[in-house]
Curated annotation (Swiss-Prot):
Name the UniProt record assigns to this protein: 1-(5-phosphoribosyl)-5-[(5-phosphoribosylamino)methylideneamino] imidazole-4-carboxamide isomerase
Lineage, uppermost ranks: Bacteria, Pseudomonadati, Rhodothermota, Rhodothermia, Rhodothermales
Family: Belongs to the HisA/HisF family.
Pfam families per the UniProt record, alphabetical: His_biosynth (PF00977)
Keyword Amino-acid biosynthesis: yes
Amino acid sequence: MPLVIPAIDIRDGRCVRLHQGDYDNETVYFEDPVKMAKLWRVQNAQTLHVVDLDAARGEGEHNRDVIGKMCDALDIPIQLGGGIRSMDQIEAALDRGVYRVILGTAAVRNPDFVERAVEQFSARRVVVSIDARDGEVRVQGWTEGSGLDAVAFAKDMEQRGVRRLVYTDISRDGTMDGPNIQAYRTLGRQLAHAKVTASGGVGEHDDLLDIQTLQPYGVDSVIVGTALYENRFPCQQFWAWQDKDAVDLDTFSTASLR
């Protein structure tokens, strides 16, 4: 089974989900990202995927403090994406406790920057996100097209030393309509060294089984957001939303750590 990575997207300090990347189609699921992160941890999360939606659109880094508190509160790695576009920002995120940073817009607009970042911080700490709609990479919080083909861009990133790519099919993101298996398979076939984390569309357990068939193509993990918030998996019945305030969020599970 692929590693399931819960997603926490933060906008204006709250946990939200966007439908197909549309900032005007937002659902607020939780007011406190730190408490949300702890809840995923007691559900045995082994790592978290955090996106700063405000920073992704260039609207400031006012969520960074709460992200630092999330890192302080947990004993598992956190990967952070959204608005990281300089070496100083990478260093600041890592110093804040983030385990791994995800480069998106910066990687598209300045591929040499990715190469330098991997060289300085290592491929384990720097990964690249490929956010695509109809095969075209999009940037600036998914609001602008780049004209780049997703597979060609992925191959370029691999040649520059990147060893993990987070591939999001924007048209599936937040829909729970099922992942774009063909897109992940097509991408994986073209890569020689980089692993792929799938993202977008997972809505039920069968979708995870579909992702599992992609392991021969280097797809070894999957980011899940809306489906977890909507309690689409049977094991989540143990932590029903109506009981969340009774859960001891300071007593972590025994999941394997980093």
